[in-house]
């Protein structure tokens, strides 16, 4: 018997049902890699970021996430080059899907009990996605932003429901806008932290304060 179509599990109806000591025998999710490309490049390398945002409340299977990751990675590698981007899958398939297997052979009514004890066995995993939640993000240089949008457009066909491609105003994966990031960096108030950046706080003794300058906790 083949895999049940994901359209049967698309709507969010029940509470989250994660893998636990009460829910055993869950098959591994199809997606195992969530960061692709130049994931070790610093925060200053890639200033632009493009998001694929879900516009529906639904379940997205691990198979769909893996298919979208492959499609996006393939196009970006071909058009921009494997060193020119960092792709991140932003949702994780923690919700377990169940199936109550039914026999369809002759004399099946003698072997099975129908809907009695119909809780079902684990069949696969999916991610519970809300409206406005980011599914995929690509950070790159400004000249590759068009390629990133096209790569996410191709990845969009792997998902059910509606999605939107949004070009972020933020610097890469950080929470700062591009102008704000450049200003804070020129003031020495930003510390690189991998693909992200830390804002240095303005704390310290009044006696240690230089006139017209903020306190920097790293100083």
UniProtKB/Swiss-Prot annotation:
It holds the Pfam family Ribosomal_L16. The keyword Ribosomal protein applies. The keyword Ribonucleoprotein applies. GO terms for molecular function: structural constituent of ribosome. Gene3D superfamilies: Ribosomal protein L10e/L16 (3.90.1170.10). PROSITE patterns: RIBOSOMAL_L10E. One of its GO terms (cellular component) is ribosome. SUPFAM superfamilies: Ribosomal protein L16p/L10e. Keywords: Ribonucleoprotein, Ribosomal protein. InterPro entries: Ribosomal_uL16, Ribosomal_uL16_CS_euk_arc, Ribosomal_uL16_dom, Ribosomal_uL16_euk_arch, Ribosomal_uL16_sf. One of its GO terms (biological process) is translation. Component of the small ribosomal subunit. Mature ribosomes consist of a small (40S) and a large (60S) subunit. The 40S subunit contains about 33 different proteins and 1 molecule of RNA (18S). The 60S subunit contains about 49 different proteins and 3 molecules of RNA (25S, 5.8S and 5S). Belongs to the universal ribosomal protein uL16 family. This is Large ribosomal subunit protein uL16y. It comes from Oryza sativa subsp. indica (Rice). The gene is SG12.
